[in-house]
Amino acid sequence: MAKAKFERNKPHVNIGTIGHVDHGKTTLTAAITKYFGEFRAYDQIDGAPEERARGITISTAHVEYESESRHYAHVDCPGHADYVKNMITGAAQMDGAILVVNAADGPMPQTREHILLGRQVGIPYMVVYMNKVDQVDDPELLELVEMEIRELLSSYDYPGDDIPIIKGSALAAMNGTDKEIGEDSIRALIAAVDEYIPTPARAVDQPFLMPVEDVFSISGRGTVATGRIERGVVKVGEELEIVGIRPSKKTVCTGVEMFRKLLDQGEAGDNVGLLLRGVDRDGIERGQVLCKPGSVKPHTKFEAEAYILTKEEGGRHTPFFANYRPQFYFRTTDVTGTVELPEGTEMVMPGDNLKFNVELIAPIAMEEKLRFAIREGGRTVGAGVVSKIIA
């Protein structure tokens, strides 16, 4: 039989399982692949290979599956620390998450922590799978746990009352026993994910943005800025804005070049050189961005959610204290900034994850959800995400 061709006719959504250790995230992931994808056994998922994202080693398992209407890429992490790192670095972006809660235990500390992290790093939607319902005989107890989950979600600004909660047993689904709480619950879960988690806007449909990686001048033609287009489309003749580091200014794109060929336009994912009108060689630099005018603003103060590397991961060997001044690496450049720790936090140990405020010495084109690395002399010591812009 000929190999099946990958059809790109369904919209693509990135998703993942989150929740407390041993509540059944990996079993649920395996069960979903049994009914909607190419079956992957528990140990194939649990033995996730290590990956490096922004200099940090993370173990994540990736599976894919399809519903009637969509194609899903699903990420599952073996350990709690992997989740923290994954969510903060955005190594595996999530358009939505399936929160797995053991019905017998109810929400536990990591349940809370994953919901908080989801809020901080901008996971917009969650659907709940209440697992191991066969271990609870009392229907009133199940109702109490459901209420508790909804209240917890609401306390972190998720719409707790509206979020779908599916009850079932991932193990029964895996073993093909007790269809009602097994297979049926998995089908109900994917139906809920299909319906409740919206398809994200594709990168090309978002406003244009390209981080500037390099700048050079072509005699007689002007200045060219090169980089990989992060989102949107740029057409020859369009007005663009140069944002970050220095006061913003406007220019016009007079040419788009890729692989030494001239194009009418460049789009998300393309590595291009953009020819800019009226900009001299010193008028634009690495670390700035070219974007649709007015779509992104420069900022210096923000609240961050960050993970600090352990010594074993190549991070610091010692804690840091208030007024710590590392470099913050945004997109293509380092900017020095001062860390202001939250009240009651005296020091931060390697391996911690926490939120703190940062003030940069120069403005950077910034939006919520933007990822960055924390560096000391070119060595990565942490990773973070902008959770809120202050100024």
UniProtKB/Swiss-Prot annotation:
Matches recorded under SUPFAM superfamilies: EF-Tu/eEF-1alpha/eIF2-gamma C-terminal domain (SSF50465), P-loop containing nucleoside triphosphate hydrolases (SSF52540), Translation proteins (SSF50447)
MF terms (GO), sorted A to Z: GTP binding; GTPase activity; guanosine tetraphosphate binding; translation elongation factor activity
G3 as annotated region, ranges: 76-79
Q: Where in the cell is it found?
A: Cytoplasm
Residues bound to Mg(2+) are 26
Domain spans labelled tr-type G: 10-201
List UniProt keywords, sorted A-Z. Cytoplasm, Elongation factor, GTP-binding, Hydrolase, Magnesium, Metal-binding, Nucleotide-binding, Protein biosynthesis
Where, by residue number, does GTP bind? Answer: 19-26, 76-80, 131-134
Region annotated G2 sits at: 55-59
Q: Which InterPro entries match?
A: EF-Tu_GTP-bd, EF-Tu_GTPase, EFTu-like_2, EFTU_2, G_TR_CS, P-loop_NTPase, Small_GTP-bd, T_Tr_GTP-bd_dom
Question: What superkingdom does the record give?
Answer: Bacteria
Q: Which PROSITE patterns match?
A: G_TR_1, G_TR_2
Q: Which residues form a coiled coil?
A: none
Q: Which Gene3D superfamilies match?
A: P-loop containing nucleotide triphosphate hydrolases, Translation factors
Annotated region G5: the residues are 169-171
One family from Pfam that matches here is: GTP_EFTU_D3
Give me the ranges of the annotated region G4: 131-134
Q: Name one GO cellular component term.
A: cytoplasm
Q: What is its EC number?
A: 3.6.5.3
Q: Which reaction does it catalyse?
A: GTP + H2O = GDP + phosphate + H(+)
Q: Enumerate the residue ranges of region (G1).
A: 19-26
UniProt similarity note: Belongs to the TRAFAC class translation factor GTPase superfamily. Classic translation factor GTPase family. EF-Tu/EF-1A subfamily.
State the oligomer form and interacting partners. Monomer.
| Function statement | GTP hydrolase that promotes the GTP-dependent binding of aminoacyl-tRNA to the A-site of ribosomes during protein biosynthesis.
Q: Under what name is this protein listed?
A: Elongation factor Tu
